[in-house]
Amino acid sequence: MHNISKHHSDRYNLRKFGELPYQLVRCGQFLGKWGLYENVMFNYQWLYAKMSACPLQAVLFDFEDSCEHLTDKDHRREITLVADSLRLGGAILDQYPDMLAPQLIGRLLSESDNNKNIKSLLGQCDEEGLVQNALIPTYHCMHTPGGPLKYSLEGHPFAIFAFRLTPDFRYIVSVSNKFITWDVAT
């Protein structure tokens, strides 16, 4: 998976993207050389390739699924921080997966000293992310996950003048020059 670029000739093993995280979680292979952390959750090349081939929701599902099966609260916190960073940058990452390294570094740099897996991931972003995007932040410069901002609803070309939450709290409908329905449950 080295030197992955966004060309139409790129081909991805979609079965591997779906099955590997699922199977590693089910057999409890979180740590070690062949584990979930090193090969999937905190692996820049894996995340970038999966984001290039699959929708963001598929990537987030891997994080949510692993959190459900984890007992270690420190590992759960690290996985949640990365997932929330991806969620916060979702509007950009859905269209431009090349922004993965800047998004992760800009949001998680302040967390790297206390979280070894995040530190490893950001090191990979710093070294390998330059292949996709030369604009890598050197300082923490974006909203940190875990704060009051949970979602960023970006998609309107003009100012939003109204929005409503559905009674079941699952969707937000926003109005500008067009209506957009946002699924906030996922």
Regions found by a protein language model. Give the residues of each.
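WD40/WD-repeat beta-propeller blade N-cap
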Residues: 153-160
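Conserved strand-to-loop turn within each blade of WD40 beta-propeller repeats
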Residues: 175-177
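Hydrophobic repeat-domain scaffold segments
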Residues: 1-148
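Residue-level detector of Asp-centered blade-edge/turn motifs that repeat once per structural unit
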Residues: 167-168
